[in-house]
């Protein structure tokens, strides 16, 4: 069952300017180590970060909190399943919120899609409650 839905549209130029202005301080404050390792290898580095930024925002909207209301940037991270498909990893208060939305006997899983077409990056998140024991290949608890 669907327990949350979120979307976000991000201007890649905004991320480019933040990286130029604040450098590693911005990147380390907003992005997980996994996201940094993935994005820093990309030719279109700012676009990669912008997609992840949009996914974090969309994930926070799917949780019903937004980033400012109790969930921090690094508590939502874009990770890839063994198949390469992206999903979200929730930690801390984001994980607590995901679990609070999830009915008894179920576990949360985030379906996401991210894309970019300069100057835009976009993300959609569908947060699903899956019955426990269903093939679980996504949301890591940590």
UniProtKB/Swiss-Prot annotation:
One of its GO terms (molecular function) is holo-[acyl-carrier-protein] synthase activity. Disulfide bonds: none annotated. GO terms for cellular component: cytoplasm. The keyword Transferase applies. Its EC number is 2.7.8.7. It is found in: Cytoplasm. It is an enzyme of class 2 (transferase). GO terms for biological process: fatty acid biosynthetic process. Mg(2+) binds at residues 8, 57. The keyword Chloroplast does not apply. Its cofactor is Mg(2+). Its main location: cytoplasm. Gene3D superfamilies: 4'-phosphopantetheinyl transferase domain (3.90.470.20). It catalyses: apo-[ACP] + CoA = holo-[ACP] + adenosine 3',5'-bisphosphate + H(+). Transfers the 4'-phosphopantetheine moiety from coenzyme A to a Ser of acyl-carrier-protein. Belongs to the P-Pant transferase superfamily. AcpS family. This is Holo-[acyl-carrier-protein] synthase. It comes from Maricaulis maris (strain MCS10) (Caulobacter maris).
